[in-house]
Amino acid sequence: MEIKIAEKNNLSARLIVEDVDTTFMNSLRRIILAEVPSMAIDEVVVIENSSMLHDEILAHRLGLIPLKTDLDSYNLPEDCTCKSELGCNLCRVSLTLDVEAGDSIRTVYSSELVSENPNIVPVSDKIPIAKLAQAQKIKLEAYARLGKGEKHAKWQPVSVAAYKNFPKVKINEKLCDACGKCVEICPKRVLTLSESGKKLELRNIIDCTVCKDCVGVCPTSPPALEVSWNKDVFVLDIESTGALPVERIVLEALKILNKKAELFLEQLSVKKDEEAKVD
């Protein structure tokens, strides 16, 4: 397997994954969504709330605020040595919110959550939590823990995880007369004419949706274009919520997938040994 970075910015990446099949890509995608842990508020103790929001709605909103995650410093609650429902400083982070509207209406933002760990904070300071009327107040303490998306979507480290087969477009230059009809109909502008206008060229083939509209409008018979996809090369699009860098998400997913494969082989070996003893 080989992974190449086609595009990347602070929150998203487009990767080209080679020498794998659909089964592998589907497993990787599901693990990214459901099993790579991230930090999220899991419990809220409301001390005072005179806003229009019910306590449970307020807690729900807090739970959906993405938090920056430190996988190296914290344990999953079920793996922590404290074995406590309350948690400890190795599996839980406390955040407080103490705001009051005063004489005017105001909006409470995620920037006003105060964390005991400066590394575990909301990914954005501009996420609105509630709107307070005059003299209304919210005072609470929230507890964030590591969790997995398979339990609740608030623990998913990504907002997008999708893949497709890498497109494959072949141009038969002997048949193509550069009429330009395929260029006009291509929704992703993958096809273009050369500067001289006498030759059909490809650009950004990774954007091709394999719609085959270009093949349908080609006036030659047979068409001068062949559009298909590579069976063992894929394009993986990932958009992080900001909880973890994209690279860390992919690496953690690959580690988890590798552990699952090792466990399966181990169990398979044990099963074969048991059957051999019976025989």
Short names for language-model regions:
Residues 1-279:
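Protein-protein interaction/assembly regions in multi-subunit complexes
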